[in-house]
């Protein structure tokens, strides 16, 4: 999760929004990512907020993060940001 956190934490909302569009996240996938990364919720809290089981939430979460990390420039940018 650290690469997706690095990318999300870059602070450039236009790049993040463009990545979401390019990854073709559906509403629930986007909501899952936003609850964990923007609202700092645990997966359990986010699942409750979405009125789904933790297992279903994890399906949304992993689908969303896999789609985002499958975009080559997102992966490269996240790796660059992750270098300390």
Can you describe what each PLM-predicted range is?
Residues 1-6:
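General nucleic-acid-binding
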Residues 7-22:
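Short, Lys/Arg-enriched N-terminal segment that forms or immediately precedes the first helix
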Residues 20-21, 37, 48:
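Residues marking the start of alpha-helices
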Residues 22-30:
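Short helix-coil-helix linker/hinge
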Residues 34-41:
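Short helix-capping/turn signature of helix-turn-helix
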Residues 44-45:
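Residues within the helices of the helix-turn-helix
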Residues 50-74:
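DNA-recognition helix of helix-turn-helix
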Residues 73-84:
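Short, basic, alpha-helical segments at the C-terminal edge of helix-turn-helix-like DNA-binding modules
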